[in-house]
Amino acid sequence: MAWTPLFLFLLTCCPGSNSQTVVTQEPSLTVSPGGTVTLTCASSTGAVTSGYYPNWFQQKPGQAPRALIYSTSNKHSWTPARFSGSLLGGKAALTLSGVQPEDEAEYYCLLYYGGAQ
């Protein structure tokens, strides 16, 4: 069986109360099915902490965004076990372990700057 690369697109979706804030994600990543990949989300204001309540969303073509992770590492009941959220090196991180073909999508992070301390 041939392995088909998956393309994971990451877009910034993090408007906050401070118009000068910039949130950065990898523009795109490629991973083979069964592999593991970590997507990150950084803030120009400094290290991302749990006080930013990092959220992660997945959007597939023609569909509305679907929430995956909230408050850094909490999963919704519909979030597959292979998705996990964490803080890594001052960034919010989303890790996919055992990537499946259906994981090909755009992934967004959302940070709440009003709650950051």
Curated annotation (Swiss-Prot):
Region (Complementarity-determining-1): 45-53
Disulfide bond positions: 41-109
Top-level taxon of origin: Eukaryota
Signal peptide range in chain numbering: 1-19
Keyword S-adenosyl-L-methionine tagged: no
BP terms from Gene Ontology: adaptive immune response; immune response
Keywords: Adaptive immunity, Cell membrane, Disulfide bond, Immunity, Immunoglobulin, Immunoglobulin domain, Membrane, Secreted, Signal
Keyword Ribosomal protein: no
PROSITE patterns membership: IG_LIKE (PS50835)
Start and end residues of each stretch annotated as Framework-1: 20-44
InterPro entries: Ig-like_dom, Ig-like_dom_sf, Ig-like_fold, Ig_sub, Ig_V-set, IgV_Light_Chain
SUPFAM superfamilies, per database record: Immunoglobulin (SSF48726)
Region (Framework-2): 54-70
Location of the region described as Complementarity-determining-2 in the Swiss-Prot/TrEMBL record: 71-73
One GO term describing the cellular component: immunoglobulin complex
Domain Ig-like: 20-117
Location of the protein in the cell: Secreted; Cell membrane
Chief site of localization: secreted
Subunit annotation: Immunoglobulins are composed of two identical heavy chains and two identical light chains; disulfide-linked.
Role description: V region of the variable domain of immunoglobulin light chains that participates in the antigen recognition. Immunoglobulins, also known as antibodies, are membrane-bound or secreted glycoproteins produced by B lymphocytes. In the recognition phase of humoral immunity, the membrane-bound immunoglobulins serve as receptors which, upon binding of a specific antigen, trigger the clonal expansion and differentiation of B lymphocytes into immunoglobulins-secreting plasma cells.
Record protein name field: Immunoglobulin lambda variable 7-43
Organism: Homo sapiens
